[in-house]
């Protein structure tokens, strides 16, 4: 029948594109709460009655995709609810029934876009935890004013334009306000004078001046925010850590005013010039991620100890510049492209931790020169993943080295990695090698080695040298071409796991 294929195709399409049936209502106890989806029906009421006595912290209910009648029914039946979570309830239009729950201590509301009036929460003065994330909330926060016992505050709305109404909470240490566009930060500062940690993620902030009055502020996050000028924060005496990840700003140079800051965590911005870091005497941790920086020389004039370069939008260039950072202790190269002169890192005399992760010059370019390690007399751990390397045989006797991990090394070049140099490290206790072709393991012996992990490793001809390691207690091998005979003759205390 010539129409059979067409008929079958139409039937298949009908099945694929037919509207899916709504999920059936459900209710069950999960951990420390009762979860209810789709409806508060008689079954849900029965489940709560049967399970509530088993909840050690009182009745806590999680609601998903319920309507006004459902919320009213629940609150009428159980006025002793201690905690409530309301999520994904697009049909819900009113929170009025919550006003009856006088024993509530925790409220978590999100995705209730049809709810615009949050005043029913005003009478819940026993609340200690409040989380409201919904764009249905607009204007100010005056409905919050009576809630003076809060210990956790997390508020989010794209339509929030004023922080007026935040209750007086002098003992509150941490608070989060997201997506808001407040014209004035003064109400926040006045009500929460002793904050040590503040998240203003995705907010639009024209003037940061009021934040300088937060005398105890230690951490500040502007993740995804729009910030006109960072310099007012120079007057915040205890500010040590600042997150400006994905911030929109035309004035990153104003970060140079923050002489007191010790940690700057950024990325995914339009940052191209970091000359301002040279003026930050207390800066210890600095990250650059997916940015346009081409000149890293200002870092040589800093006291930065922890530095990460991650997936930059321009070639990284000469690593010898990084090698001139006098105080650098921890260096992480993450998805680095266009890097040259890795041997120039040999001058990092204070380096304690070195990591290459994900890839190194994957799109082409120089292999990483392991001759650089010879100058790292303080390094304790080395981890290299997804990089081609050269001069592995030049690895020196690193006196403080304790851990080495090699993963997917030389997969592009196909070259063998000579690991014998690591055996010269007198304190090496853990060696991990995954997905590599190696040489030098047959004579690998170091006095402090305790564990060795090998997975998908080729080139192993013998493990005889390991028998001379007095502290060795575990060998784990997976998918390696090693004969069983090579695993014989070890001390009884050595636990050998083979998969």
Model-predicted segments: where are they?
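Positively charged n-region of N-terminal signal peptides that target proteins for export
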Residues: 1-5
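Concave beta-strand-loop units of leucine-rich repeat
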Residues: 33-42, 57-68, 73-76, 80-93, ...
């Amino acid at each position: 029948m010539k129409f059979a294929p067409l008929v079958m195709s139409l039937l298949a399409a009908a099945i694929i594109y037919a509207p899916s049936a709504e999920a059936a209502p459900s209710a069950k106890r999960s951990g420390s709460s009762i979860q209810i989806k789709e409806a508060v029906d008689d079954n849900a009421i029965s489940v709560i009655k049967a399970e509530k006595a088993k909840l050690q912290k009182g009745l806590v209910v999680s609601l998903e995709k319920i309507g006004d009648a459902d919320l009213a029914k629940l609150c009428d039946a159980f006025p002793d609810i201690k905690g409530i979570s309301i999520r994904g309830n697009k049909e819900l239009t009113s929170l009025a029934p919550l006003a009856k729950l006088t024993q509530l201590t925790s409220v978590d509301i999100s995705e209730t876009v049809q709810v615009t009036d949050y005043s029913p929460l005003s009478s819940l003065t026993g609340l200690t935890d409040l989380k409201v994330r919904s764009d249905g909330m607009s204007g100010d926060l005056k409905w919050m004013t009576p809630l003076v016992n809060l210990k956790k505050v997390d508020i989010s709305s794209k339509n929030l334009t004023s922080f007026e109404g935040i209750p007086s909470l002098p003992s509150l240490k941490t608070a989060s306000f997201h997506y808001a566009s407040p014209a004035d930060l003064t109400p926040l500062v006045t009500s929460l004078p002793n904050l040590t940690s503040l998240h203003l993620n995705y907010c639009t902030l024209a003037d940061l001046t009021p934040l300088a009055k937060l005398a105890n502020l230690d951490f500040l996050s502007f993740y995804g925010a729009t910030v006109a000028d960072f310099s007012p924060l120079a007057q915040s005496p205890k500010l040590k850590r600042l997150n400006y990840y994905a911030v929109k700003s035309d004035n990153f140079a104003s970060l140079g005013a923050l002489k007191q800051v010790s940690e700057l965590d950024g990325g995914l911005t339009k940052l191209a010039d970091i000359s301002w870091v040279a003026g930050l005497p207390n800066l210890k941790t600095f990250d650059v991620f997916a940015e346009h920086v081409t000149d890293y020389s200002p870092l040589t004039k800093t006291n930065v100890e922890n530095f990460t370069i991650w997936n930059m939008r321009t070639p990284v260039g000469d690593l010898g510049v990084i090698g001139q950072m006098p105080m650098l202790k921890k260096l992480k190269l993450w998805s680095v492209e266009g890097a040259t002169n890795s041997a120039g890192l040999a001058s990092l005399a204070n380096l304690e931790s070195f990591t290459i992760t994900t890839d190194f010059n994957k799109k082409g370019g120089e292999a990483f020169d392991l001759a650089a390690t010879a100058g790292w007399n303080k390094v304790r751990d080395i981890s290299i993943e997804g990089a081609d390397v050269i001069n592995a045989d030049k690895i020196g006797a690193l006196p403080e080295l304790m851990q080495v991990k090699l993963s997917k090394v030389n997969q592009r070049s196909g070259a063998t990695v000579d690991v014998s140099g690591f055996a010269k490290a007198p304190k090496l206790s853990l060696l991990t090698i995954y997905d590599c072709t190696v040489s030098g393991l047959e004579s690998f012996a170091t006095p402090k080695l305790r564990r060795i992990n090998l997975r998908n490793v080729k080139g192993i001809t013998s493990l005889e040298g390991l028998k001379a390691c007095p502290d060795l207690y575990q060998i784990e091998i997976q998918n390696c071409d090693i004969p069983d005979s090579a695993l014989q003759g070890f001390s009884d205390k050595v636990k050998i796991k083979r998969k």
